[in-house]
Amino acid sequence: MSVSPQLAQLATWMAGHFNNLHQAIAEPVWFANIHVYQCPLPWSVFQGIGFYVEQLYDIYPDQPYRQRVIHLFETPDGIRIQNYALGSPEAYKCAGRDLGKLASLAAAELELLPGCAVQVEWTGSCYRGRSVPGKGCIVERKGRTTYLYSEFEIGADYFHSLDQGRDPETDQVVWGSLSGPFRFVKKQDFSCYLPRWS
C-alpha cells in the first residue's frame, strides 16, 4: 500500500461524523440540522481509499436520505473522487453509527456513476473540490432531468459542502441550496478506521 502525503491527509480529514447544528440554529429557514457520516472502507474494496457516505436529518436518525460510496485516487491532474451507487443500500443503512456493517462490503456491490466525479486541489491550508466539467452526473428528480453540481472545502475539523441539481440547458438551480454551502463541524473522528498504508 502506497499513498501520497496529500491523499493521506485528505482521507484523514474526511473520515468522521460531521454536523451543522450551529448553522441550523442560526439560519433555520435555510438549513436543516443534518448529519454526514464519512466511514472508511476496507482497502480491498478499491485496492485503495474508499468511504461509505451517509446523510440524514437529525429528526430522522434511522432514515438516511443519501447513501453512496466514494473512491479517492490520484491522477496526473491531482486527486479525484469518484461516486458509486450501492446495489443494496438497505443492507448498510445507518452504518455511520455501526461501522462494523461495512466489513463485508465488496466492489461487486457497487455501480459506477458515470460523470459523477469531483476534482480536488490543495490550497495550502485546505482541500477544495468541484465537479468535473461536462454536466455528466445526471439526476432525475420529480420528473425533471438535472445534472449534479458539487463543490466542497475541507479542513482538519470542518467540511463545507454544496450540492445542486441544475438544468442542463439553462444551468438554473432546480434543487439544492440557494443560500450557500452547508457548514459542517467534525463531531467524531473516524481516521483510526482508515487502512494502514506505508
From Swiss-Prot:
Keywords: Lyase. It comes from the Bacteria. InterPro entries: CpcT/CpeT (IPR010404), CpcT/CpeT_sf (IPR038672). Its EC number is 4.-.-.-. GO terms for molecular function: lyase activity. Disulfide bonds: none annotated. The keyword Lyase applies. Belongs to the CpcT/CpeT biliprotein lyase family. Covalently attaches a chromophore to Cys residue(s) of phycobiliproteins. This is Chromophore lyase CpcT/CpeT 3. It comes from Synechococcus sp. (strain JA-3-3Ab). The lineage of its organism: Bacteria, Bacillati, Cyanobacteriota, Cyanophyceae, Synechococcales.
